[in-house]
Amino acid sequence: MREGPWTGRYPAAAAMVICALVPYLALSAALQPITPIIAGDLHMSLQAMSLASGMANAGYAVGTVLAVLLAQHLPQRRMLVIYAALLVVGSVLAAAAPDAGFFIAGHVLQGLCTSLLLIAAVPALVVAFSISKLRWTAMILNVCIFGAVALGPLVGGIQAQADGWRPLFWIIAGIAAAALVLSLMTFQDAPPADPSATRNPLPVGLAAAGCVALFYGASELLTHSFLDAVTIVPLAGGLALIVVLLVYQYRAKRPLLCIRPLGSTLPVSGIVVAMCAAASSISAVALAAVLLTNQFTPVHLGLLQFPEFIAALITAVLLGLVFRTRGLHYLVLGGMLSLIAGILVLQSQLPPTSLLMALGSGLVGLGVGGSVAPALFIAGFSLRNNALQRVFAIIELLRGVAAFAVGPVLAHVARTVGGSPAAGTHTALWICFGIASAGTLFAVSLYALGGVRPPAPALETWQSGEAPAWYSPPLLARIRDSSRATVLTEPLACDAGGHYGGPRNGDSAEPAADRAGAAT
């Protein structure tokens, strides 16, 4: 196939990623104020709307695994164009939906295609351009994922104030169409990543069954108790299937996902931080906002949450400044502390005042923007860059489960615990505080017990594919007296086909590890 006229141009490729990721992520956060309007127009119950959102989130989580499998055996850039086209189809179906069935199908397709595009496009943007562009990619990723979510409440509030919903969905469809056009303009044919890789569909099946069950159970919490069979059985069963997927991929000789190489100090710390920050941040702001829905107009309430978006922009700039330094690790720590502070501000007075709501959402925005994206790169830099797609897939699967499944559970706690919504929200916010604090303490403890002095990433080494950007010690290295151990991060690297093995070109493990350590 012919190359697009903008092939190799970073601004066009970055714009394509932005247009691909922003629609669904912003829409998922904008739905709350317009949900009653959509339900009334399409003759849906609020429970049906909850189920639609849950299945769309399940599609987002499953797509991360499906994208990796398809990338191994099908031309990657051609698949990216197909994903973008399907995103347009889903967006148009949702925007023009005459009834509930079309809306649910379109919205689920939006969630699925967004994660397919994330896994197909973002790793290529990271490794296909020069190192000088890498910090810009990190900043763009931060704004796309977290800035879009933070902007959602204001966008939804503006649309709710106009007493409609279709204009917003048509705008989303237009942005998706721009992503499709840009994917064609930047097209450069790329072969499958590894046709000899496993074709086993079981990992995708486990992910699909687990996510659908988990998000179905979470969505049913709107009208059922937590211990009702229709909620607790799919919740527990879905979570169990996801655990089975992780264990199965860890033990597999030819895995689809790189689980075993992530089992050292820095990747585990990064993944735990990303999950805890995602689970606590989205829920905290949304829970506090619910208490103010009867006091303010949707636009006013959206403006009170707008500081979260400003904070996401600030943390994107900070990420760019520290990206090549050891400050990357300290940015994550500072982000988690800011997140904890924001949760405490929100729960200090319920319902919160306008000042407390704005201040709390700003601190939460600083927290999630300063922790999740940097933590993803901390995990990714711990492996060779050829494993980046697989690393992003497993991290986004876990982050998506944490962000979208915990929220309905905490919302159920806020509605049912205590004698009033304020009392229930107070309890739910303390749970958010506990999640964020536990994740922070766990990560700091792993650094201490692993004997880690935060390193600066050796980006040249990582970009060349020779070795990880730094050496990540085994878990609990100090307790296990790993100063004499021979287990190194580098031999655990995952090649393009998902095989585990030592350094390339027949090099021994020791020189490869030394090279990575010397570069940092």
Task: Label each residue range with its predicted role.
Residues 157, 161-272:
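Hydrophobic transmembrane-helix bundles of small-molecule transporters
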Residues 57-60, 64-201:
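Helix-loop-helix hairpins in multi-pass membrane proteins, especially solute transporters
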Residues 68, 95-102, 184-187, 218-224, ...:
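Transmembrane helix-loop junctions and nearby membrane-interface residues
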Residues 1-9, 446-520:
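Intrinsic disorder in cytosolic terminal tails and internal cytosolic loops
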Residues 32, 119, 140, 145-157, ...:
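Glycine/proline-centered helix-kink
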Residues 3-17, 200-202:
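N-terminal membrane topogenic signal
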Residues 10-27, 31-42, 46-56, 65-68, ...:
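12-transmembrane solute porter fold
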